[in-house]
UniProtKB/Swiss-Prot annotation:
<keyword id="KW-0873">Pyrrolidone carboxylic acid</keyword>
<comment type="function">
    <text>HRBP is a myoactive peptide that excites Aplysia heart and enhances gut motility in vitro.</text>
</comment>
<feature type="modified residue" description="Pyrrolidone carboxylic acid">
    <location>
        <position position="43"/>
    </location>
</feature>
<keyword id="KW-0165">Cleavage on pair of basic residues</keyword>
<keyword id="KW-0527">Neuropeptide</keyword>
<dbReference type="GO" id="GO:0005576">
    <property type="term" value="C:extracellular region"/>
</dbReference>
<dbReference type="GO" id="GO:0007218">
    <property type="term" value="P:neuropeptide signaling pathway"/>
</dbReference>
<protein>
    <recommendedName>
        <fullName>Abdominal ganglion neuropeptide R3-14</fullName>
    </recommendedName>
</protein>
<keyword id="KW-0964">Secreted</keyword>
Length: 85
């Protein structure tokens, strides 16, 4: 009977993974090393800022028809407090 030898399969997997990882590393080192994370954080921060701005613009308080519900919801859910985690 034929005994299945999986060493070559493992080697193929290892080689594939290594090539992918080196490819990623080359792409990342094209910029400065931590540029990816800082760019990501900046984008997320801007997203929160713009969400807050748009929220304030669209839900202006006043004697509007829905102002009663908006105030109640803001009281109940406490507004979106951002924590710098």
């Amino acid at each position: 009977e034929e005994v299945f030898d999986d060493t070559d399969v493992g080697d193929e997997l290892t080689n594939a993974l290594e090539s992918v990882l080196t490819d990623l590393k080359d792409k990342r080192d094209a910029e400065e090393p931590s540029a990816f994370m800082t760019r990501l954080r900046r984008q997320v921060a801007q997203m929160h800022i713009w969400r807050a701005v748009n929220h304030d613009r669209h839900h202006s308080t006043g004697s509007g028809r829905h102002s009663r519900f908006l105030t109640r919801n803001r009281y109940r859910y406490g507004g979106g407090h951002l924590s710098d985690a």
